[in-house]
Amino acid sequence: MARYRHSRSRSRSRYRRRRRRRRSRYRSRRRRYRRSRRRRRRGRRRGYSRRRYSRRRRRRY
């Protein structure tokens, strides 16, 4: 059991590292939309569930 847990944590850290690298690439592009999106988000948040909205956002960019 201990061995399984160790391997799992290792794979997770590797995935996280890869994800971070990808994020930095699009950071400059996303910064532009952050301000405009925040204002809109407050009104829309009530109507849509959080999970559904986040999925939609991801597809757009």
Curated annotation (Swiss-Prot):
Stretches the record annotates as Disordered: 1-61
GO molecular function, one term: DNA binding
GO CC annotation terms, alphabetical: nucleosome; nucleus
Listed GO biological process terms: chromosome condensation; sperm DNA condensation
Expression (tissue specificity): Testis.
Location within or outside the cell: Nucleus; Chromosome
The keyword DNA-binding belongs to this UniProt entry's keyword annotation: yes
Disulfide linkage: none
DNA-binding recorded as keyword: yes
Superkingdom assignment: Eukaryota
InterPro entries cross-referenced by the UniProt entry: Protamine_P1
Alphabetical keyword list: Chromosome, Developmental protein, Differentiation, DNA condensation, DNA-binding, Nucleosome core, Nucleus, Spermatogenesis
Family recorded in the similarity comment: Belongs to the protamine P1 family.
Function comment: Protamines substitute for histones in the chromatin of sperm during the haploid phase of spermatogenesis. They compact sperm DNA into a highly condensed, stable and inactive complex.
The protein's name: Sperm protamine P1
Gene transcribed to yield this protein: PRM1
